[in-house]
Regions:
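Generic alpha-helical hydrophobic packing signal
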Residues: 2-14, 49-53, 90, 103
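A solvent-exposed, acidic/Ser-Thr-rich amphipathic alpha-helical stretch
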Residues: 22, 28-79
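Hydrophobic alpha-helical core bundles mediating ligand binding, dimerization, or RNAP-core interactions
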Residues: 8, 12-15, 27, 35, ...
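Residues at secondary-structure transition points
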Residues: 2, 43-47, 97
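Short, low-complexity N-terminal intrinsically disordered segments enriched in polar/charged residues
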Residues: 1-26, 30, 127-130
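Short, mixed-charge, low-aromatic patches
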Residues: 8-18, 41-44, 60-64, 84
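A beta-strand edge to alpha-helix "cap/lid" segment located at domain peripheries
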Residues: 3, 57-130
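Hydrophobic pocket/interface hotspot
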Residues: 8-11, 23-24, 31, 52-53, ...
């Protein structure tokens, strides 16, 4: 597996452990992070690693039990990595399970994760939260 794909894999593992220092350490200081519009935690494009923690990871841990990112496949093209998989978790407020397929497009620059774009059916998340 490529170094870029290993970085993406390490990021997902750090998210699953709620390992904030590793998450921040993997992200480029000049970040371009975009969640899918309509995703509950979407608020435009984030430019700083701490934004990912504050606007995504903290709310995920607050709102979901057993949240995980299960990657089924990586498509690697140099410094670009596409990961295909499923989000899973149980919403704490509703008790509903969220199985949600996703595609993530990553770009590595200067040995760090520099860009993230999420593609997913955001309605599935909203249904689990209602």
């Amino acid at each position: 597996m490529s170094e870029a794909a290993e970085m993406v894999r390490a990021f997902y593992a750090a998210v699953s452990r709620a390992d904030v220092p590793t998450v921040i350490g993997l992200l480029h200081s000049d970040l371009h992070w975009t969640e899918a519009e309509g995703f509950p935690y979407y608020s435009g494009t984030w430019r700083h690693p701490q934004d990912v923690v504050d606007k995504l990871l903290v709310p995920l841990m607050r709102d979901w039990d057993d949240f995980s990112v299960v990657v089924d496949d990586f498509i690697i093209a140099g410094e670009r990595v596409v990961s295909l998989g499923t989000y899973a978790g149980v919403n704490k407020a509703t008790g509903k399970v969220m199985p949600e397929p996703f595609a993530h497009v990553w770009r590595v620059a200067d040995g760090k994760l520099a860009r993230f774009d999420m593609y997913t059916d955001t309605l599935l998340v909203h249904r689990a939260m209602e």
